Amino acid sequence: MFSQCLTRVTAALAVAGCLTLTGSANAHATAVGSTPVQTFQYSVGGMTMKVPTGCMFTHAIRGSGKKITYQNAGVDCGFAGALGSGFCNWRIDFTYADTRNRTYRTSRGRTHNECKIDPMRSNSPQTLPRYGKACASLYVTGVRRVSQCHHITK
């Protein structure tokens, strides 16, 4: 299990590096960013669950201008984080805000009642009505635990 998770993390970092470094003659943009998931505890069915350090929340987005052709977010855990029970009652939301930081659209993910060490969600392609930022957030038992955003500009 540990080597499998370490392999996934290594592959994810390699893909992220490729996406970030790959250039294109067209005006297409790709952004990939990761934010560490802070250690936290929560209760599920009377049991205390602990998420240790070693997990990263990664948000990838592709498109051009206000048009998003691909968007995905998820958690990858390595080392001690891969040994934990994971994230129970989780969901991933995508939110969109204007240049004044006012959220105008939310794509709320489905709440997954199972526990998963590597929760992930993709969102459908779309065209945004305005520039600003696109964010992905991980919720566990209804509490936002980590977010990662990308600015959408001309």
What name fits each language-model region?
Residues 30-100:
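Short, surface-exposed binding/anchoring microloops in extracellular/periplasmic proteins
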